[in-house]
Structures are given as structure tokens and as C-alpha cells.
């Protein structure tokens, strides 16, 4: 049956209801970032997933500008000839003057056009450009900081390209240049210094100083007003980088951040209040069947179980059907990503499960790339033993089946004592002997280069989670990105996430947080914090996040010990859920995916571009932001199946398929009633109504969006236009609509 999704977020609060699409015929958008076709971090995901939505809006007038890397071009880019004579003349002019500029199509969804600048080929001009940067912006870059030097080269090449492109056009187009992060920020500063007619936007996905300060175990968010930013940046030897970032934020026509929590941070550290908050989204896959993602979960979980069977050979004394898989993934920042809190909570969870005699087992995965030199021999041996046991079992099964077939064929019952011969028993005994081992299953799947000082391994030694038989919580540290070609765990990241039961991301510093967002889109419950952009976004858009499988951990107003206790409580309550309750919760989690779709969140970027055009070209574009009436906002209400707690929810159909559910005695009660997921989804869609947006009538007043000044404007002014305050989804939310 087709999956009908809620239209609850077809219009987000604080953004104008555009009735007329913006006409980009004489406007060109360049999106500049170091991670264009060059995977380094999360910005790559932002650009990759947003490309289709932006391309649909701008068409062939949308270009991405990034650095040329041989690996990236070979695997991700199809080199092409420039499609317009102006662009071809621009590239030819730059190449004739000693630069190397490439043009092509990024082979991702949407297929955006890309301009790639070879920074290495322009190193001959580095010292001259660094001198010009000092004369123009008073920013000095030390010779030893290669990343900052690359940023200088990339910035000057970007400015050169934009200036040359404008010069080659007889009819000057309206150019919007959107720069992401400090590595691209030098180009923005130079565009303004050279007075290029370009509307500029700067988006910071995380502040440099914020990341360094949070890693230093300081009470960051409660002391934002007290930091001496110049002193702190200087002590960490990143003052020149900080100056690049701050200069870009102040030079931009429009300054944006990815979350409200980062907006507060940027206001204090970069000394400019963001004009608008642009949350990160994802491309949401629409499932054709109601329970398709549940089937994918079961298939992926089976792949993980195969790995667990091999990893814990000889100590597989727990029931895999009563085993939950938790995971944390991301950049290896032990404190910033909350790995310290997660480990402490796992130790406490292990104690609770043991003293309460729980039959539930938890396997916690840490997917964080670290320095290794090879696979752990014991881990490889475990997978080899598992495969050998499987081959042995298949051999015995074939011989048994053949003898049984021959016996039945002649019309006699087989003699079970003769079905297996001595050779078969010897083979099976050898297989059993191969599973014997004296040591505990390894905690780490690889050999670490810094085993004695590694933060995760050091903490595991302190809390004593060694994967012993008595432990109900097992820990597996996989210090490498997941790959479907791995000899250990041959699954890619998406398949691994689908197979797990819970993602745990108790980050202290997380400007947005793509990992919990990806969990939500895949229908996997997750734990986030009120210090992450994703956690704040969901907390402010959902009346009861935990009912939808979004657990928000308080790390801002609680001590570290209290946060650990709260996380332990979340984990323990999740372990107490039955399979039926987890199915219901996953259904609810997956229904939130529309809230994270670029189809809706892309409108924040649209609003930022309109604002930049109005500021850069005030004679041709107008933009009048209006305050938002709180009554126009909305929040996802509690699920229609009241009460919202999964522990009290009714059965998920079909009831007979829940073989793990405990038998119940007595007459049917409320908890034993049939739970119809399709019916509950329909109730949610009725309850989660889109707000009624006022229609705009024609008038001579200017609109709240950026339009040509000679276009017919509308009135009365919509109360849903972008406010002057930093636009977060939180700033205009009303109460829950019933």
C-alpha cells in the first residue's frame, strides 16, 4: 500500500509562502566550499544532498566551486566543456595566465555543474597573495600552516574566477556567491575588498574557536560571554584562522549558521548575530510499502548478527534474539562527541542489567576512525572460525539429507544412529574444539598505534567492560569507516545504521548532527542532546520527542554525572521495551523524516539568497522581513495512539508475528488491543495539519521576498515572512495544534 506522508511541514514557520517561483534567468548562483567533490567532513553531505533541490530552483545557473583533487575527479566528476561562451572564455583566460581550472559535472543526485580550481598549480603566487591579504585585511598567515595557505590560494583563485566571469559577460548577471566555512572565506573577503558586484553569503557550520574550546574541557556554553576570543585563539595557535573566519562573517551580506545553538555561539565568538538559521536536511526516500523499512531493518540486523557470532565465538552465551545493538559514530573527538558519557552510561547500564537479572544483552559499537596498523588477529580468526563452522554444518546437512532421502525412497524409516558416521562426528568435534578460547573477545577490531593512550580503550580499562561472560553490555570499537568490502564487517554505513536498534550521540559540541538525522530518516530511534543543532530543532518542533524515538539528553543545565545518569535511564528504559514496542516506535520515528527533507528545509537557503540579493542590489530587489505571529507556528503533536509512551502502546499488527512477546493471561485488556499502523498514521496526518497560510493579494507594496523592484507586489504583508531575528524554526513556533 502506498505510504501517504503527512503534509505538516509543507510550509515552515517564519518563511514567506512563495506563490511565484524566483526567476533566475538573469541571476547565477555559485556555491563555494572546500568539500565540493572532496569528502572531508559533514559539509560534503550538506552539499551533496542539497544539490538536487538547489538545482531544481536555479537550473543551469547553479555552479559549485571547489578544489581540484585527482582522486575526487577520477571517482566523482565527469569533465566537460563549459556550456556557455562566457564561462568558456573565463576558464580559457585563467588557464592562459598560469592557473589550472577544470569544469565538469559532479556525479551525484541532481548532477550539478562544478568548477574545480587547482590550488597546487597556483602555489607560485602564494607569497604575493599572502602579502596582498595582509595589505587588504591585515591577516597574516604563517608558512607552516598548510591548510591556511591552501585557504589563501583557494580564496584568491575563487575571487579571480568570479571577477573574470563578470568581465566576460556583456550583460552583467546578478551573481550570488555562497561561501561555506572559513576555508572558503578568504574569497568572500576579497570579493568585498575588490568591490565585485556579487551578493555574498557566509555559512559557518561550526566555529573554529568553539570546537577547540569544547575539546579543552571547559564549561563552554555557560561562559560564552566571558571568553577573551583573541587570547583564546592565540593560545591555541589558530589566531590567523580565527581572523579569516571572523572577517568572512562580517564582510558577508548575509551571515547564516546551521542551528540556533550555533547562532548563539557565533554571536559571541565571531561578534556578529546571524541573519538567518539554515538547518541541514537530507534527501528522504519515500517507501512504497508501509513496512518496507522494517524489513530492511531485519535484513541489516541479520548481517550484524553474523559478525557478532564470529566476534564472540567461544563466548556466545547470550541469546541473539534478545540482543540490542547500540552505536555511536563520527569524528574521533572523545569529549565533543560524547564518547566519554556514553561509556560511563554503558558501565552503569551493565550494572543495572546484571542486578535486575535481565535476559537482554546490549552490544555497543563505536565507529570512530583512529590510527591503526592492521586488523586484530583474534577478530579475523573469529570470522574465519564462523565461516568454517558454517561450511561444516552445510557439509553434514547435505550428507544427512542425502541418506534421509535414500531411506525414504525405499519406503523405510531411517535408523537415526546410522545417519551420521564416525567421520561426521570427528568433523563436528573438531569444529567445536575450534570455538574454544581462553581470552575474552577483543574490544577493538584493529591494532591501535596508540593503544596505551587511546581515550576509548583507556576508559574501557577503567570501567572494566572487557566482554566477559558476566557482562550484559558488550563493547566493540571499530576504528575505521565501515565498508561493504571489509573482511570483518562487510556492510556500508547506511546498512549498518538500519540494522541497529538505537543511535547514541551525547555530544557536547555538535552544531548540527547528521548522524541522528540519518537515524531518523531510516526509522531508527536516537539519543541526541540539547547542545546539538538537531536535538534543539527536534525538541522545538515536536511536542513529545521521546514518543517518536527522539531522546533529548540535557547536557547544558546538568552536571556531567547527572547527564550520565539521565543517559543510563534512557538506555535502560529502551532495553525494557518488547519487540512490539520497538516496532511501534520505529514507525513513529520514520514518520518524522519529512521534517528533515531538503524539500522543506531548502527554503531557508532560498530565503537567505533572496535577502542577499536585496542587500547587494537594492535598486533591483526588495526584501521586507516581518515578525511572525506565534499562532501561525506549529509543532508535531503527540502520536494519535494515546498514551504516547511506547511502553504503553498497543499491539502492532500482525499480533501473531510477535514471537518474542511474553504470553499474557486473563481477558484482553487495553494493551492487548490490535494496533493498526495504517490507521494510526492516518490519525497522525489528521492531527499534524499544515497551518493555514494567508493568501497574498496584489498591491503596490513590496513583498517579503526578494523580487524585481518593477514586479507587482502583494499585500497585506504576510505574518510568516522571515523575521529580522536569526531565523530558527524555534523562533516562531506556536503551541501544539490539536
Where are these regions (language model features)?
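Catalytic cores of nucleotide-sugar-dependent glycosyltransferases that transfer UDP/GDP/TDP-activated
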Residues: 1-738
